[in-house]
UniProtKB/Swiss-Prot annotation:
GO terms for biological process: mitochondrial proton-transporting ATP synthase complex assembly. It is found in: Mitochondrion inner membrane. This is ATP synthase mitochondrial F1 complex assembly factor 2. GO terms for cellular component: cytosol; mitochondrial inner membrane; mitochondrion; nuclear speck. It comes from Bos taurus (Bovine). It comes from the Eukaryota.
């Protein structure tokens, strides 16, 4: 895979001065779309219309080229990303498409579109508070009272993650069997808001995306801090579902598809956060892990 990435990078460096006509990142040659009222939803499949994918460096960052035309966002903006690593990852998404372009599999492209167009028109503070609000309904904080086997499973699997987060950030989170959930101290919210404020807007888009997939800020922090793997975080977010499946069985194809999709979205969002973060140390640790 990295050979392909290096090839894309080398080709991209030879295409620094291409014409500025472009293709939309959601539909290629499609029309400019109006601003939606929520985050982008990838469109349906369409036939692949390009042969080669490359990256190039422009004034605003790194660009994606499909043949000799520059990729653009659904709102018609030049598709420009802040790092070469992210550009290579996005280019790989486009290059890996076969006869049919399946935009719903191109999570990095969708996250870039959201970051560039900001269809929900939210600022940094709003993104942060949307993520922190998930503490009120965080998956790992809600506990059942029965059956005892599930109570014990939640305690054994979720308590260590909560304990890690409390120690890592110096806060209190806790858990509850109440329908209203745990009472999160105001200081905990303040500390986590301050922590998330250290990320840039692009990374915050990725963080909120992962939080909405896992329904958990605690698990998302474990991922971004490299405390959990994607597989671990997804399993922990689905603990009760997996328990019920083990007990009652499941429709195999449906379960497998849902699980793989959740892993793919979570992995893409986590990678997006790291590739958009300003800390090169974090990126190096991610690549070496």
């Amino acid at each position: 895979m990295w050979r392909r990435c290096l090839r894309l990078r080398d080709v991209g460096r030879r295409l620094l001065n291409l014409p500025r006509s472009g293709l939309t990142a959601s539909e290629g040659l499609g029309p400019k779309l109006p601003t939606p009222i929520r985050a982008y939803v990838p469109p349906a499949e369409r036939k692949r219309f390009y042969q080669n994918v490359s990256i190039s460096q422009g004034e605003g960052g790194f660009e994606i080229n499909l043949d000799h035309r520059k990729l653009r966002t659904p709102q018609g903006k030049l598709f420009t990303v802040p790092s070469e690593a992210l550009a290579i990852a996005v280019a790989t998404e486009w290059d890996s498409q076969q006869d049919t372009i399946k935009m719903y599999t191109m999570h990095l492209t969708t996250l870039c579109n959201t970051s560039l167009d900001n269809p929900t028109q939210r600022d940094k503070d709003q993104l942060i508070r949307a993520a922190v609000k998930f503490l009120d309904t965080d998956t790992v904080c809600y506990r059942v009272e029965e059956p005892e086997t599930l109570v014990e499973l939640q305690r054994n699997e979720w308590d260590p993650v909560i304990s890690w987060a409390e120690k890592r950030y110096g806060v209190e989170i806790g858990s509850s069997t109440s329908i209203t959930g745990p009472s999160i101290p105001a200081r905990t919210r303040e500390v986590l808001v301050s922590h998330l404020a250290s990320y840039n807007m692009w990374a915050l888009q990725g963080i909120e995306f992962v939080v909405t997939q896992l329904k958990s800020l605690v698990l998302t922090l474990g991922l971004t801090d490299l405390r959990l793997t994607v597989e671990q975080a997804v399993l922990l977010s689905r603990l009760e579902e997996e328990y019920q499946i083990q007990k009652w069985g499941n429709i195999e194809w449906a379960h497998d598809y849902e699980l793989q999709e959740l892993r793919a979205r979570t992995a893409a969002g986590t990678l997006f956060v790291h590739l958009c973060s300003e800390s090169t140390a974090v990126k190096h640790k991610l690549l070496q892990g």
